[in-house]
């Protein structure tokens, strides 16, 4: 981490984890504390993963860019990449919700207590028309339909974003950029956050395998990263593009000031 070499190859590691991570379910114990969705890590970090990413990565990007140029405009331009990723995340969530509601159906289980037969150990299901997924699940009924794992999508996007935004720190230090204790501490927090996201990704793949929804979610996360960082941002800084991480920051004079 903190190097361009790590940034160039991290997406391959992440793709391998998504493809082969579900195989870990053959060895993990379903009695583990991580096999429960109510675990503290899932509740405290997974449900608000984008917020944690914005707090630590946003603070690091702002402090790094401002310590170089002392320019609020430059700092805001680099921070705008997080805004773009956030809009993309919210937009994908809305689209996925529409797809799930359009392709899925709500069912109410009929237990044998109500005098209904049970087939192969499973109660019959009564179709409920017109119910959305949120309303269906909220009423304790069963939703079946086309789904994409939003958790895997978010974790993949956050992992790749953290790797991209922090990869400039190594070259920045090599060129003599000013780096006080707060900047180094924020970089350390970003490293810890990336490790946590990878760990949660492995936990979801191992303890809650779901094919192909997790594969599709991971693919969407990787495609979003590639479209932004390997596509649009390569056009360079302009009124319609924030540019890649490090642009305008990695040209340092001998005295530690930007050219």
Language model features: what each stretch is:
Residues 1-259:
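Terminal transmembrane helix and immediately flanking juxtamembrane interfaces
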